[in-house]
Structure formats: C-alpha cells, structure tokens
Amino acid sequence: VNQQRTAQDGTDALHATASRKAAFRLLPILCLTYFMAFVDRTNVGMAKTSLEADVGISAAAYGVGAGIFFLSYALLEVPSNLIMYRVGPRRWITRIAVTWGLLCSCMMFVQDELSFYVVRFLLGAAEAGLYPALMYTVTIWFSQKQRVTVVGILYLAVCAGFALGAPLGGALMELHGAGGLYGWQWMFLVEGLLTVVVAYFVWRLVPDRPEDAPWLTAREAAVLNDRAVVRSAPGHGTLKGNVRIAFARPFILALSLIYFANQVSSVAIQYNFPSIVESLDVEGAFLIGVVSGSAGIASFIGVLVIPWIQRRVRNEVRVLTYVTVATVPVAIAYSVSDGAVLRILLIDAAMLLLVGILPLYWSVAMARMSGLMAAAGLAFINTVGLLGGFVGPYLYGLAEGRGSESAGYAVLVGAALLGVLLLPVLHRTVRSEDRRAGQEADVGSPAGAEGAR
C-alpha cells in the first residue's frame, strides 16, 4: 500500500510539473489568439457610427452585417473542426488566424451595404472553428479537474479583448485623415495585420500533442496524455458515429439552446454598446472606447468570480442555473431605466453574468465528451450559440432601424427568459447523461464485467 501511495504521489508530482510547463508555454499564445479575435469583433462596434456616416450603412443593415459574421461562422463551424481533428490544432488555428486577419484588414475597403455584408460573411467563414479548436486543444493538454480553470483563463482573454479592444480601436480611429484614410479604415488595417503576426507565433509555439512538445520529457508527455483522457462514448472510432452521437445526445442539445439564448443577449450588447454610449452624449472616439471598455472589465470580474463560486459549490450545473436566472431581473431593469450612468452599470452587470458564466457551459460539455466526439460536440454547441450571435444583432438592429428602443430591450429580456425556461431540460438531460456514464463505468470495471458474464 505504501509503495502504491508513493508511486501515485510521484505520478501526481510529475503531472503537476508537466501541467505547469504546458500552461506556461501554451496559455499565453492561446490567450493572445483569442484576445485578438475579440479585439477584431469589438472594432466593428466602434466603427458603427462612422460606417453609417461615411458609407451610408443604415442601422438595420449594420445589424444584418454584424450578425451575418456568425451565420457563416455557424455554417462552417462543424466542418472546420472535423478538418482540425484531421490536420491538428497547430496548423488549423494558424490558418484561421491568417485568413481572418487578412479579411479583417479588408474591411477597410467597404464601400456600401453589399460590400459590408460580403466581407463580414467571409470574415465569419475564415474564423469558423477557432473557439472549439481552442477548447479541443485544452482537452488534449489538461485534465478534467484543470479545465474549468484553463477555460476561465481563456475567457479572461475575451474580457481583455472587450476592455482593451474598444479603447485601442478608439485610439486608432483618431488617425482619421492620415494617409487619406478614415479613422475606421486605419483601425481595421492595423488590427487585422496584428492578427497575422499572432498567427506566426501560433505556428512556431503550439505543438499538436504532448508527445510533439520538445520541452516535455517522454514521461511528462505520457502523464499528460493519461490525465487528459475523459470518459468516451460508443462509436468513437468512426467519424460518422461520433457526429451522430454528438448531435443526438440530449444534454448537448439542451446546453446548446441555453448557450444560444446567452449569445443573443451578449452579442447584441457587444456590437451596440459603443453606439449606446455615444447616444448618452459621450464625445470622442477614444472616450467612447474607454467607457465601452467597462463592459470588458465587468466581464473580467465575472470570469474570475463565477468559476471561483463553482469551485466552492462543486456543482457547475447549479451555479449555471443561478447565474442564468439572475440575468432576467438585470435585463428587465435595463429596459425600464432612463439614467445614463445607471444604464451603463446595468449593461456592465449583464456582461458580468453573461460572459462570466461561459466557462461553465464548456466545463459541463467537456466533462462528458472526448476524442473526435468532443471535436464534433463542442463545435455543435458553439454553432448553435453562433446562430444566437446572428439573431441578437439582427433583431436589435431591426428594432433600432424602426426607431423602437423598447423592441430592442425586448430582445434582451426575451433571451434571458428563454435561457431560464430551458434550465429544467438541462438538469434532466445532464442527470440522464451522468447515469448512463456511471452504468458504462460499472460494466467496464472488473466487478461489472464479471457480473455481465
């Protein structure tokens, strides 16, 4: 017994060392990649008013263009991640970053509503698969116990993108007139090229798997592979079998729909917050960016606090439920408020909840999938959420184009209520999934196998 305990302690120490190496080597570049994704998403919100003035894009057309990014992203999400599974995360994340960076720079050539739609659609197609590819990379390198923390760190990059992207975009827009370009053209050009630079570092620094990492010993790579394994499912040896199972498992569908409701609200806020701030008589692109960045700071706090609460409660589904319910009174309060400061604070509170909860969605999913099925399942969840990213800005822009603020508020309140109504379904399907996994574990154990005989 003592020898077994000593061996286990040695394995735990080896895993801790290998995990620290992986975190130190991989998380900075993965976070930087995700940071740039949200800087590039924030910039179109910063450019909204300028695009309307300089190019003649209407509020309704802006809503369509902002959302159409998510439509093409959603259409290509699953194919993108199945390719990623074949070629490896390193090659595919690099490809994604290069193409989305170049197309982000191409936003500077937008001349009318049609070209706005086309570039936004292509931009979504280029970026399709980024987030599930990052999540899949996490499942390869980190154990289930570590993943909620690692995903939380990635979401800190999202918050940093929100918090710093708007002021950065505002600062670049102050270059208005330099070289004969509008300020928004400078913003898209510079931020797109920065993304291409980040892609180079992904190619150089991110191995596909632990055994490919020159900075790990063979024993360290082996222990990372061993601890990263989570329970699988029947049919994981075939592509068709995994896709069918991932799409048919009820807990995946329930989680996907709640994530959809979350994204309707959060993306509508993300793409319209700078113009909301401007409508509250805040002047100057940089100052508008600074005030808009408050939503990123609130999101940062949420990503720190909500996973911390989950670690204390040790029940991610329960915490997910509480936070989802809390979004309803915040959305209602925003819809009836009229003070500028209060409205900004309520938007910040909404983003704290909506973004802070995101690591829990992925923790619930990753605990119950592995291998190719994880690649397909995570992509499916993200795809459904991306459809929410299309619906939210589209409905909000449609309401704004008709001069109806109350209809825009109804989008946020309705999405919050939808998430709450779906919670009982999630609870039921997760319990069913866990019972199924427990039964499979019993059958796979020596005692279970003996009983089966």
Predicted features, each with a name:
Residues L75-L114:
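Conserved MFS/SLC helix-loop-helix module at the cytosolic interface between two early adjacent transmembrane helices
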Residues V119-L156:
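Cytoplasmic helix-loop-helix junction between adjacent transmembrane helices
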Residues R314-V364:
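C-terminal transmembrane helical hairpin of 12-TM major facilitator-type secondary transporters
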Residues G56, G88, F109-S115, A126, ...:
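Helix-breaking motifs and short loop linkers at transmembrane-helix boundaries and internal kinks
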Residues V44-G45, R244-V303, L358:
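Extracytoplasmic gate region of multi-pass secondary transporters
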Residues F162, R368-S404:
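A late C-terminal transmembrane helix in Major Facilitator Superfamily
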